[in-house]
């Protein structure tokens, strides 16, 4: 009880960055399979300004990506949640719940290490929701095509970060690598789920997928820098 009280009284820096759906004072440590009402460091202190800049860019864009993914699922559910899509709603909710965990973890890390989120969060808020809603208007196949395109882009981006950290100092970044690898695996699972639910059957699939992925790459590039 004392520990819970102390945790409840501790200022929660993540509220600066997180949407209302993310719970305060609740960090999810999925690597260890437990829910902890505490903050703990997954990053060592940066050795120099160059390392700090690298980590800031990495965390900023990861947070932006997970924020955007949450808004996409929100847009999809706003449309499909009112239709008779059957089991797909459970599938979307499962994937969205995982994205909420991802976002919550990056909220925690940004708050702890005083990393500024991208200034474009208001834009990604609107753009993500609009993308989710518009693709859902194409039907469940359109929503799944969006999922495939976005999750493929995010998993490739996470793979690039994993390579960078492995080449830099894997022992120094052990915990961060664990988190990114687990989140990468979730994104791959979402990608495969989209394919299993007829993503490729939407008219103009490859054109739609290409357009979405161009947007994702642009968002990644901009969010690292602004």
Q: Which residue stretches match the model-derived regions?
A:
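Non-heme di-metal
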Residues: 2-226
